Design a protein with these regions (language model features):
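Acceptor-binding helix/loop patch of EC 2.4 sugar-transfer enzymes
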Residues: 8, 15, 57, 101-105, ...
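Short His-centered aromatic/hydrophobic patch
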Residues: 89-94, 111
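Membrane-proximal helix-turn-helix segments that form the acceptor-binding/catalytic region
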Residues: 27, 73-80, 115, 119-130
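Flexible, charged surface loops at secondary-structure boundaries
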Residues: 33-34, 78-83, 101-103, 130
Length: 130
């Protein structure tokens, strides 16, 4: 079963500068029964990744455009080719709004921080959507 893990775009998945979410994902992935069919997607400028199954999403910031929107759009382009069964989203419930055109996939959201303070899960309406 193919699993895609999407890190927050500011999260660094490198040995030199790994964030808490990256360390969590790397640690869990080591013991997963699906580790051979799992890909971790993110954006970093470093080359020494925490695991071999990491895919660096090409990402260039465009003036007056949402960095999150560009990042998720680039991930969706990659995901349309890969066709994972499960997509894990870490710490960014607002990303779910962009995945409406990806069908036949299951989504898992990990909250590493307080969900009531995160964009995309503050209001009752947003939480019902999730």
């Amino acid at each position: 079963m193919k699993v895609s893990i999407l890190l927050p775009y500011k999260e660094d998945y490198s040995k030199e500068n790994a964030g808490a979410v990256s360390i969590f994902v790397s640690g869990i992935d080591k013991y997963s029964r699906y580790r051979r069919s799992t890909k971790v997607y993110g954006n970093t400028n470093y080359k020494n990744f925490l695991s071999k199954n990491y895919v660096n999403i090409p990402f260039k910031k465009i003036f007056l455009q949402s960095s999150s929107k560009i990042y998720v759009k680039n991930f969706i382009d990659l995901e349309k080719q890969r066709k994972s069964k499960i997509i894990e989203i870490h710490n960014r419930p607002s990303y779910l709004n962009y995945f409406t055109n990806l069908q036949k996939r299951k989504f898992v959201i990990y909250f590493h921080n307080d969900p009531l303070t995160m964009s995309g899960s503050v209001t009752i309406k947003e939480r019902l959507f999730i």
